[in-house]
């Protein structure tokens, strides 16, 4: 089974996981609409692969008031869009044992980027996706840290936990539609997310974690396999240890609160 979607809107495509996923989709035959803040990075992608395989849309997703117009523009230009990958994310150190050093503007920016903008994008594109006669997909890059936090980036973990809970509920809410809801759970991956520019307190941060090529290969195989929840690398440990059981409890709660009308189970949504 191969990746079935032919036109992918990839938000956060300028570097790291997003850039590598964009290139993998292109190489596998999907057309990619690459979105990000850094126009020059998007243009590099178009120059490398050509306009017949990729297009660039510079956009800052933290400008939330502009998201509806952004969605209208994309839909108007690409009415055959069938997959949206929401991959944008930032990670910053926060230490509340030194409250005088905590910058709430940074805390807010991280939450807007990693969670609130993703909710706004979902709302903006869902009416279009739900009207399509063919299956479409929303793919969210969550994190293994949405399941088990670490101290140094507590707000990042909280933002990803919020996204995870949103996605889990969204999947059930959209169960009767043709919109598939997919969540990726990356471990630490060797990208610029941890480099000296973005997190100077981490030594050799861009060498920390799973090699990017290995991550992309495992991720793509999960996507091509049609799975809805894809823990990768070390994230599998947390997912297998307790997350499946927690989702069973969630499933029971959903069934109970719906008077038995909604019978959803997480089994079969995850690679074994």
List each model region and its residues.
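Conserved mid-core segment of classical short-chain dehydrogenase/reductases
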Residues: 68, 75, 90-108, 152
């Amino acid at each position: 089974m191969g990746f079935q979607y032919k036109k992918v809107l990839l938000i956060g495509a300028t570097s790291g996981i997003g850039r590598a996923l964009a290139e993998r989709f292109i190489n596998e035959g999907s057309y990619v609409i690459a979105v990000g803040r850094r126009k020059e990075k998007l243009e590099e992608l178009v120059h490398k692969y050509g306009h017949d395989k990729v297009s660039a849309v510079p956009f800052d997703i933290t400008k939330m008031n502009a998201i509806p117009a952004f969605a209208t523009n994309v839909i108007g230009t690409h009415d055959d869009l069938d997959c949206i990958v929401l991959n944008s994310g930032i990670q910053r150190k926060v230490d509340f044992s030194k409250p005088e050093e905590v910058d709430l503007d940074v805390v807010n920016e991280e939450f807007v980027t990693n969670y609130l903008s993703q909710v706004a994008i979902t709302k903006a594109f869902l009416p279009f996706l739900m009207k399509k006669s063919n299956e479409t997909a929303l793919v969210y890059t969550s994190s293994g840290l949405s399941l088990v936090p670490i101290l140094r980036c507590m707000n990042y973990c909280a933002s990803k936990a919020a996204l995870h809970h949103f996605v889990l509920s969204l999947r059930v809410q959209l169960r009767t539609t043709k919109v598939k809801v997919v969540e990726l759970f990356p471990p630490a991956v060797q990208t610029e997310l941890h480099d000296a520019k973005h997190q100077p307190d981490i030594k050799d941060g861009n060498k920390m974690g799973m090699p990017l090529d290995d991550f992309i290969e495992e991720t793509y195989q999960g996507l091509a396999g049609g799975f809805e929840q894809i823990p990768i690398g070390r994230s599998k440990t947390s997912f297998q240890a307790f997350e499946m059981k927690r989702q069973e409890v969630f499933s029971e709660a959903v069934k109970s609160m719906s008077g038995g009308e909604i019978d959803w189970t997480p089994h079969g949504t995850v690679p074994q």
